[in-house]
């Protein structure tokens, strides 16, 4: 196996051990880390220059003279007055258009003009809804009158009339109905718990293991 293929490369040229630790060990032809830091530094310096230039211009005499000239000329006041007059004119135009539509609808309802189209009615309804939303809420509509009772308008045909007969009752004896019954059974006796065989004393346990038990003897000796 060629272990040199695992070493760092600069393009197609492998870096040997005498290059490790110096500036040649960059991992490629372009140092991306250095490029990013340079771009960040350039952006920071550009923003700092723009901020300083704008700050100096705002605090300069030229800017103060321009601002004072605009205030003395009354341009801002004229623009505000013009905006207010334009808004008032638009409101008057909308009110006049609504009055004209109402007058036209009244004439058409009285028959003085042709019937109103569906588009005109829809536009008028939307205008009234907008006016009601801006002003007072509309009055509640009156309850509709009750409908008259339905009256048949045709006579019945004898051939199509069917006679209603009473239900037929049979004289046969009634069939007994099976009623389910339940048997009373005694509950099952409780289960007895079997006692587990427990060994007795330790001597009996030893007897079961060895078969002969442990022989003990007491002997008194004098010295």
Curated annotation (Swiss-Prot):
Entry keywords, A to Z:
Capsid protein, Cytoplasmic inwards viral transport, Disulfide bond, Host cytoplasm, Host nucleus, Host-virus interaction, Late protein, Microtubular inwards viral transport, Phosphoprotein, Ubl conjugation, Viral capsid assembly, Viral penetration into host cytoplasm, Viral penetration via lysis of host organellar membrane, Viral release from host cell, Virion, Virus entry into host cell
| Inducers of expression | Expressed in the late phase of the viral replicative cycle.
- Extract the signal peptide range: none
The similarity annotation says: Belongs to the adenoviridae protein VI family.
- Quote the biased-composition stretches of kind Pro residues, using this chain's numbering: 138-151
**Proregion positions:** 1-28
Q: Where is this region: Disordered?
A: 136-155, 166-203
Site annotation (Cleavage) points to 28-29, 212-213
Compositional bias (Basic residues) = 189-198
In residue numbers, the region (Binds to importin alpha/beta, involved in hexon nuclear import) covers: 213-223
Q: Which portions of the sequence form the region Amphipathic alpha-helix essential for membrane lytic activity? A: 29-53
In the record's own words, the domains note is: N-terminal amphipathic alpha-helix domain is essential for the membrane lytic activity. Late-budding domains (L domains) are short sequence motifs essential for viral particle release. They can occur individually or in close proximity within structural proteins. They interacts with sorting cellular proteins of the multivesicular body (MVB) pathway. Most of these proteins are class E vacuolar protein sorting factors belonging to ESCRT-I, ESCRT-II or ESCRT-III complexes. Minor capsid protein 6 contains one L domain: a PPXY motif which binds to the WW domains of HECT (homologous to E6-AP C-terminus) E3 ubiquitin ligases, like NEDD4.
Q: Where is this region: Involved in endosomal membrane lysis?
A: 31-52
Renumbered to this chain, region (Interaction with hexon protein) spans 47-73, 206-212
Modification after translation: Ubiquitinated by Nedd4 following partial capsid disassembly; which might play a role in intracellular virus movement during entry.
Q: What is the official name of this protein in its record?
A: Pre-protein VI
Give the record's GO biological process terms: lysis of host organelle involved in viral entry into host cell; microtubule-dependent intracellular transport of viral material towards nucleus; viral release from host cell
**Domain of life the protein comes from:** Viruses
Query: HAMAP family under this entry?
Result: ADV_CAP6
Q: Compositional bias of type Low complexity: which residue ranges? A: 166-182
Quote the record's miscellaneous comment.
All late proteins expressed from the major late promoter are produced by alternative splicing and alternative polyadenylation of the same gene giving rise to non-overlapping ORFs. A leader sequence is present in the N-terminus of all these mRNAs and is recognized by the viral shutoff protein to provide expression although conventional translation via ribosome scanning from the cap has been shut off in the host cell.
């Amino acid at each position: 196996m060629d272990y040199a293929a695992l070493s760092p490369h600069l393009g197609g040229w492998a870096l040997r051990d005498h290059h490790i630790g110096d500036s040649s060990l960059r991992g490629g032809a372009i140092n991306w880390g250095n490029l990013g830091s340079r771009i960040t530094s350039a952006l920071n310096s550009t923003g700092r220059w723009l901020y300083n230039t704008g700050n100096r211009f705002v605090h300069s005499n030229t800017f103060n003279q321009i601002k004072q000239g605009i205030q003395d000329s009354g341009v801002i006041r004229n623009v505000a007055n013009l905006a207010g007059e334009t808004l008032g004119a638009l409101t008057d135009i909308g009110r006049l258009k609504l009055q004209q539509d109402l007058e036209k609808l009244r004439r058409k309802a009285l028959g003085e003009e042709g019937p109103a189209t569906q588009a005109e009615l829809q536009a008028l309804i939307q205008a009234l809804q907008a006016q009601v939303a801006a002003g007072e809420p509309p009055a509640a509509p009156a309850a509709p009158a009750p409908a008259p009772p339905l009256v048949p308008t045709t006579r019945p045909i004898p051939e199509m009339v069917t006679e209603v007969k009473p239900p037929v009752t049979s004289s046969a004896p009634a069939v007994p109905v099976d009623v389910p019954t339940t048997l009373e059974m005694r509950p099952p006796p409780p289960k007895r718990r079997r006692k587990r065989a427990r060994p007795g004393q330790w001597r009996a346990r030893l007897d079961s293991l060895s078969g002969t038990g442990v022989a003990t003897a007491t002997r008194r000796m004098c010295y």
